[in-house]
């Protein structure tokens, strides 16, 4: 069974200082399985922040996927991939997780996560 590799790169785009923890830089999962991509941010007021997820295909710009505000996906702009993508947020652990279901070759991209903080 072929493996689908998801290359993960997280960006903490903030206008204030924050710290980002990445448990895995890249992951490999079998095709048609699921992958969970998580990041933890040490930023004040994480529970009230909107977390945005993007992907970047080779030689392309960033493409918006979806965002989460409280605990579940609030917006899905993934071009009909609603059943494929889920995002969650855990305010107690300051973690956001993107779940990609039914992995296929086109999912081998760089994933970005972002949070904007206003002063």
UniProtKB/Swiss-Prot annotation:
GO terms for biological process: adaptive immune response. Residues 1-18 form the signal peptide. Residues 23-119 form the Ig-like domain. The keyword Cell membrane applies. One of its GO terms (cellular component) is T cell receptor complex. Glycans are attached at residue 32. Keywords: Adaptive immunity, Cell membrane, Glycoprotein, Immunity, Immunoglobulin domain, Membrane, Receptor, Signal, T cell receptor. Transmembrane segments: none annotated. The keyword Nucleotidyltransferase does not apply. Most probably, the gamma-delta TR is not assembled due to incorrect folding of the gamma chain. Gamma-delta TR is a heterodimer composed of a gamma and delta chain; disulfide-linked. The gamma-delta TR is associated with the transmembrane signaling CD3 coreceptor proteins following the stoichiometry: a single gamma-delta TR heterodimer associates with one CD3D-CD3E heterodimer, one CD3G-CD3E heterodimer and one CD247 homodimer forming a stable octameric structure. Upon activation, gamma-delta TR complex associates with FCER1G to initiate intracellular signaling. This is Probable non-functional T cell receptor gamma variable 11. It comes from Homo sapiens.
């Amino acid at each position: 069974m072929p493996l689908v590799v998801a290359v993960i790169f997280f960006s903490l785009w903030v206008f204030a200082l924050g710290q980002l923890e990445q448990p895995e830089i890249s992951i490999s999962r079998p095709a048609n399985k699921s992958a969970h991509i998580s990041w933890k941010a040490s930023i004040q007021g994480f529970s009230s922040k909107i977390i945005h997820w993007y992907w970047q295909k080779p030689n392309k710009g960033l493409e918006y996927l979806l965002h989460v505000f409280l605990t579940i996906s609030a917006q899905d702009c993934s071009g009909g991939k609603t059943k494929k993508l889920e995002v969650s947020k855990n305010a107690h652990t300051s973690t956001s997780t993107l779940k990609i279901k039914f992995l296929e070759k086109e999912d081998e991209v760089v994933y970005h996560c972002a949070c904007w903080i206003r002063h």
